[in-house]
């Protein structure tokens, strides 16, 4: 196996793991974090979500979230260069799923909702009403992120299998 083949397999593996980790994180929010927040008073839920949205912006999360985007972009280019070799289509689909379903969805839908929530005083009646609008919409887009991240991981694992020498 050439060094280029080895590097490609490592890049696919790293990207698949990143997608899987992000999918797991989003799954946790879809499965129980948001449900738990819905069970507590609105003021506490808004305060908790505001805190989560601040704390999540840390080096480790950003390295995983953006690093997976960077490796996905790299795989898109690599898939184009290798076309139509085995695994190229799976690499392209997996990478595109992560970029569209996680990066684009996060930037266009979840982040603006989080920013709007951050501007609210949790003790206000406006915050309570906003919370009831925020949760269903935020969850919907988070489900999209969960499904696309896990699907991207699956496509990339298929690419890993198909691209092996």
Regions found by a protein language model. Name each.
Residues 5-19, 80-100:
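Interfacial segments of alpha-helical transmembrane regions
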Residues 21-66, 112-136:
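Interfacial loop at the N-terminal end of multi-pass membrane proteins
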Residues 31-33, 49-53, 70-82, 105, ...:
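Membrane-helix exit/interface motif
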Residues 64-75, 146-154:
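Core segments of transmembrane alpha-helices
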Residues 92-111, 115-119:
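Acidic/histidine-rich alpha-helical segments that form the ligand environment
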Residues 135-150:
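Hydrophobic alpha-helical transmembrane segments
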């Amino acid at each position: 196996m050439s060094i280029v083949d080895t590097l490609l397999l490592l890049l696919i593996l790293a990207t698949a793991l990143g997608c899987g980790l992000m999918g797991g994180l989003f799954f946790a929010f879809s499965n129980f974090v948001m449900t738990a927040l819905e069970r507590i008073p609105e003021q506490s839920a808004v305060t908790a979500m505001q805190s989560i949205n601040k704390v999540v912006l840390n080096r480790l999360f950003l390295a995983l979230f953006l690093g997976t985007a960077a490796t996905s972009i790299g795989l898109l280019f690599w898939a184009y260069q290798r076309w139509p070799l085995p695994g190229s289509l799976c690499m392209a689909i997996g990478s595109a799923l992560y970029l569209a379903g996680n990066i684009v969805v996060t930037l266009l839908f979840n982040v603006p909702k989080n920013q709007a929530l951050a501007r609210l005083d949790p003790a206000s009646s406006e915050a309570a009403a906003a919370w009831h609008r925020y949760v269903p919409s935020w969850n919907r887009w988070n489900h999209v992120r969960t499904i696309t991240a896990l699907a991207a991981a699956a496509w990339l694992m298929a690419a890993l299998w198909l691209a092996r020498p």
